[in-house]
Amino acid sequence: MATYVNDLRLKEIATGDESGTWGTSTNTNLELIGEAFSVGTEALSDASTGTITVQDGTSDAARSMNMKLSGSLSQACTVTLAPNTLSKVWCIENNAGDVVTISQGTGANVVIPNGGIRMVVADGAGSGAAITDVLDVLGGTGNIALGSGAMGVALTTGTDNVAIGENALDAVTSGTDNTAVGDNALGADTTGQRHVAVGSGALLLNTTASNNTAVGYNALTTTTTGGDNTAIGDFSLDANTTGGSNVAVGQNSLGANTTASQNTAVGVSALLLNTTGTRNVAVGYTALDANTTVSDNTGVGYNALTANTTGSNNTAVGSQALEANTTALNNTAIGYKSLEVNTTGATNTGLGSYALALNTTASYNSAVGYNALGANTTGAQNTAVGYGALDANTTAANNVAVGFEALSANTTGASNVAVGSAALDANTTGTYNVGVGYEALSASTTTSQNTGVGYRALKANTGSYNSAFGMSALQTNTTGSNNTAVGRDALVSNTTGANNTAVGYLSLYTNSTGASNTAFGAEALEKNTTDSNTAFGYQAAEETTTGDFNVAVGASAFEDNTTGAQNTAIGGYALRNNTTANNNVAVGYLALDVNTTGAQNVAVGAYALDAASTASNNIAVGYRALSQNTTGNENVSIGTDSMLDNTTGAGNVAVGMESLANLTTASSNVGVGKQALNTTTTGASNTAVGFQALRLNATTHYNVAVGTGTLYNNVASNNTAVGFEALNDNTTGASNVAVGAYALDANTTASNNVAFGKSALGANTTGATNTALGGDTLAANTTGGSLVAIGYNALAANTTASYNIAIGENAMVANTTGTDNVAVGYGALDANTTTSYNTAVGKNALGATVAEGNTGVGREALS
């Protein structure tokens, strides 16, 4: 029985009933036929030439259609296929290690690089036989053509072209690097380069253009010279002639385009009707499909810009974005149905699903976020950023909303600004409002001209003309108007209070209905509830609740006041502890600092009256004036450190630096002049007017000192000194009266002296009960007592004598130690020095007397 053993599974008859010589020959031939269609390997020797001969009637690897060349060539080798009359096709694979040239005769050869594969045919023409690469078409090189008329007969120098299909690339002459797959693909191309045409009629009319890619039936079918186009899809760019640099992906995309360039269309019928419009981008089913001649539009998404005809510079990204736009310019819509019904509205921007979805003719709007400005129809120049921002706005213009549902209920309210989630979200018709921050002005509906900046600033507001800057500033305000709050929680509790100004953290925090208050500084007027208070500074008037018409300026000024009214505190900690007292004025750091219930006080200067707690009706002007006063009332202290140490003393007046500085509990003193009554502590009812008047007086009373240095050293009581340094040295002398410059100037311990006139009793130290009236009267007296001198120079030289009486100018002018003399008249007893018991009445009476016991009455008697 016959067997089936060869590679072609042909019947071999050498066995069975057909065996015999003929059967054996037949078997051999059948095996050789099978070998011809199989794979064979020929080993090449390392030489520059070699021959592979197909043997007659015997098995031979050279007979195989797929012949592999092996070996280890170190040089190029020319292999001759023999015999030269053999006409056959081989697929030769070169693995011999170097370049192999396949030859048969003197005709053409085929060069196969190491590792290369070539399909060759030997023409068997004898000595002139040639080897041809069956895939190297006509005159070019590296070309592949499959199909009737593929690459035709015109190709001369074109290289590396591929044509598959009837008449594909059939007109090409010198074109290179083209690929045409499909009937008539690139059928008219002559010199064009780097084209790819896949599909029947693709790039059919292209002649000289280059760098086109067409995939699909009739894709780019009419293009002649337009280059750098890409068309993927049946009829894509099928009307294009000279337009270049276009991209069309999808059936009918850019289907009407003729000469326009630089368009991109991705999607069925995208840019379908475009003819000459350039630089358009359409991505999505029917995107920009009505666009004809306008340029610079971008439509990405189903029906994006689908109705656009002449509008340019538009951008639409998202299904149905700018779907109804026809002639409008410069719009940007990104998101599902963004600017969907817009027709002629220009220069709008919508980013987000339904952003500006109902806008028709309005222009210059910007919407970013889901449904932002979603209901807007004709409102212009609005800006909305955030989910639902301005989503109810219809016709209002010039609004700005940034944040989740910012201005979300606004319909016709114009010129509002809302930045922050739910900012101004209830506003409907209110205008000129500004809300910046989460829920800022969120309850405002129809009110206008409010400004709220900060978390929940003016959150509950329904009033107008309010300004709030800071977290929760004016948060609970309802109908209050004309309020200004700057700082976290400033005026946070205000409901109906109007005309308030609060600047600073917690300023006017508790105020709800109080009006016309002004608070500048953290916690200023924090607990205020009433009207017309003014506070500037940290914690100024912080505790004030119902007190009104107060003014507090300075850190912690008037801090603890509760119900006190009509007070003024200016300076850090001024009137800090005041609680219920009224009508106080404190100006200066710590002025009236500890005052609680004391009223009608005036303190001007740092530390002035700073220890006073319940004292009233005091006036302190100057640094530390009345600084230690606690309960002393009705004092007046003007000057640095004046009445510095006074605690309970009342009814004192101190004018001048350090005047009455050491006074503690005494009352009814008057000190006018620097250091007047400076050391007085408990002495009362003293009056000192002049620089250092009564300076050292401490505990004594009822002294009067008028003039610089008067009673400077005094520590006694009941003295009166008027004049420069009058009674200047007096210490313990009491009940003296000195009027005139240097009067009783040296007096120390003497008492009951009276001196009127310049230097009267000027040298007196311990002499007591003297009376001197007139300039230089008793001027030299030191210890003499019970003397009377009336008249200029009377008893002027008297030193220690006592009991003399001299009345008249120069009376007893020379007397020094004489006693018990009486001289009345000009120059009476004027020569007497040491004698005693004389009486002289009359001008110059006893004028020359120097003896004792004389009596002279009359002009110049006994002279």
Predicted regions and their residues:
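Tight coil/turn sites that cap or link beta-strands
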Residues: N114-I117
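Short, glycine/charged-enriched secondary-structure capping and boundary segments
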Residues: G105-T106, N854
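Short, surface-exposed terminal/edge motifs of secreted or surface/virion proteins that either
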Residues: L30-S38, D98-G105, V121-L135
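Residues within well-ordered beta-strands of beta-sheet-rich folds
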Residues: C91, M119-V121
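Exposed extracellular interaction/assembly regions and N-terminal maturation sites
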Residues: M1-R9, A14-V100
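Surface-exposed loop/edge segments in extracytoplasmic proteins
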Residues: A108-V110
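Glycine- and small/polar-enriched repetitive beta-structure motifs of secreted/surface proteins
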Residues: A122, V134-S863
